[in-house]
Swiss-Prot record:
GO cellular component terms, semicolon-separated: cytoplasm
Binding site for ATP: 125-131
Compartment(s): Cytoplasm
Keyword DNA repair annotated: no
Biological process per Gene Ontology, one example term: cell division
The EC number(s) this enzyme carries: 6.3.2.8
This protein's UniProt keywords: ATP-binding, Cell cycle, Cell division, Cell shape, Cell wall biogenesis/degradation, Cytoplasm, Ligase, Nucleotide-binding, Peptidoglycan synthesis
HAMAP family to which the protein is assigned, alphabetical: MurC
NCBIfam families to which the protein is assigned, alphabetical: murC (TIGR01082)
Protein name in UniProt: UDP-N-acetylmuramate--L-alanine ligase
Pathways involved: Cell wall biogenesis; peptidoglycan biosynthesis
Organism: Ectopseudomonas mendocina (strain ymp) (Pseudomonas mendocina)
């Protein structure tokens, strides 16, 4: 029987002497979910951001005090400030808090505090964190366990990226981008893969990144569980160094939990799962691609370990409605003679781009892929330039939007115009440079053919393009 919100609040230990919690940058994807859970636990929550958004309006409707813009007075009544790694001590609210000796804590430290008195499940890895965390929330809910979850994307079924559950389980993403996942002390940790990304955090040293993942896994208690994808060569390399109980997953024959007989039919992927001492389990997920099979395998490994029955696992996976901006299908965009399928995706690393392209080719092999891509950060574009050139060259038609800087200064040679030149030199594709995403509709109109798949991808403001295109007069008029 589900507990009432009051009963959940009563069972969760309070942070003594903390009444009002202020978030600097409350509209951020990593911040708003924690704020929402704290609101539901009965804390007073305030927060500031540079502009209003649907996220800040939602939090305001739940009782949060929202300030637009950063100002010293916003923080004066707070008992603690929560900040992301993007906020520094020059921020007037942080400066005021430090002057008044109000604690200033990283976002991950507040998440760790929420996890402290629960059975925490932390999902780490360069790729697949959000989808795996979301699948876990779906399967645990199907199993009647009603978890608390904090996700880096909007879970479509819940309409939010965070929710206070009635059980002892808390499922959350563990962020390696700033090494803040080291604050977490979960009972179960997942590592989906380890790739060279956010290398400035690690001084450009990949060995340091690998050691940090081992340190994260050793935050588990000696009776905890590390769930590791052995299809990833770096994770496999680190496996002998993990001094905790482990369960491995993947397509590899030596994986503890593995997938066989994979087939893709459009958006839906079917496969059979083999587990130790269990009957084979036939499952499906409403997501394309082998990368999503791996995300589902991690979920199945944990659900099986927690005793969730197979029927609930199957139901939670098959009924999963996806996550915002993770191969999110906006619908059919009318064009001459038919329509194109419009898809939005958050992928911003060459490995993620390659996985999505492979999924499109697997599910819709006869259709052209028209791709609108926006690189994210000049530093990532520079560090992974050759990989981007190779993978983006696999599209049938490519439009490259200028790099989304995410606060960085331009780096010579690490921009979309130069990347267009490099892709063109390969002789397979003639990409189109686009300075701003708002210019896309008239460019796309003559390029699209009936039956195409139009993929808008990247982690920057390109996320606004698909919802704009579906309503754009140039395309809406086609259906009349």
């Amino acid at each position: 029987m589900a507990k009432s919100p009051a009963a959940v609040k009563a069972e969760v230990r309070r942070m003594r002497r903390i009444r009002r919690i202020h978030f600097v940058g409350i509209g951020g994807v990593g911040m708003c979910g924690i704020a929402e859970v704290l609101l539901n636990l009965g804390y007073e929550v305030s927060g500031s951001d540079l502009k209003a958004s649907a996220v800040t309006e939602r939090l305001e409707s739940f009782g949060a005090k929202i300030f637009i813009g950063h100002a010293a007075e916003n923080a004066e009544q707070a008992d603690v400030l929560v900040v992301s790694s993007a906020v520094n001590t020059s921020n007037p609210e942080v400066a005021t808090a430090l002057e008044r000796r109000i604690p200033v804590v990283p976002r991950a430290e507040m998440l760790a505090e929420l996890m402290r008195y629960r059975h925490g499940i932390a999902v780490a890895g360069t790729h697949g964190k959000t989808t795996t965390t979301s699948l876990l929330a779906s399967v645990f809910a199907a199993g009647g366990l009603d978890p608390t979850f904090v996700i880096g994307g909007r879970l479509n079924a819940a309409g939010t990226n965070a929710q206070l559950g009635s059980s002892r389980f808390l499922i959350a993403e563990a962020d390696e981008s700033d090494a803040s996942f080291l604050h977490l002390q979960p009972m179960v940790s997942v590592v989906t893969n380890i790739d060279a990304d956010h290398m400035s955090t690690y001084g450009g040293d990949f060995n340091r990144l690998k050691k940090t993942f081992i340190e994260f896994l050793h935050n588990l208690p000696f009776y905890g569980l590390a769930v590791l994808c052995v299809d990833d060569p770096v994770v496999r390399e680190l496996l002998p160094q993990v001094g905790r109980p482990t369960v491995t997953y993947g397509f590899a024959e030596d994986a503890d939990v593995r997938a066989i007989n994979v087939r893709q039919e459009g958006m839906r992927t079917y496969f059979t799962v083999l587990r130790p001492d269990c009957e084979p389990l036939d499952v499906s997920v409403n997501m394309p691609g082998n990368h999503n099979v791996l995300n589902a395998l991690a979920t199945i490994a944990i659900a099986t370990d927690e005793g969730i029955d197979d029927a609930a696992i199957v139901a939670g996976l098959s009924g999963f409605q996806g996550v915002g901006r993770r191969f999110q299908v906006y619908g059919e965009l009318p064009v001459d003679g038919g329509s194109v399928m419009l898809v939005d995706d958050y992928g911003h690393h060459p490995r993620e781009v390659a996985a999505v392209i492979k999924a499109v080719r697997g599910g819709w092999p006869e259709r052209r892929l028209v791709m609108v891509y926006q690189p994210h950060r000049y530093s990532r574009t520079r560090d992974l330039y050759d990989d981007f050139v190779q993978v983006l060259g696999e599209a049938n038609v490519l439009l490259l939007v200028e790099v989304y800087p995410a606060g960085e200064e331009p780096i010579p040679g690490a921009d979309s115009r130069q990347m267009c030149h490099s892709i063109r030199q390969r002789g397979q594709l003639d990409p189109i440079y686009v300075e701003r995403g708002v210019d896309l509709a008239p460019l796309l109109k003559p390029l699209l053919r009936a039956g195409d798949i139009l993929l808008c991808q990247g982690a920057g403001d390109i996320g606004a393009v698909a919802p704009q295109l579906i309503k754009h007069p140039l395309f809406v008029g086609e259906s009349k």
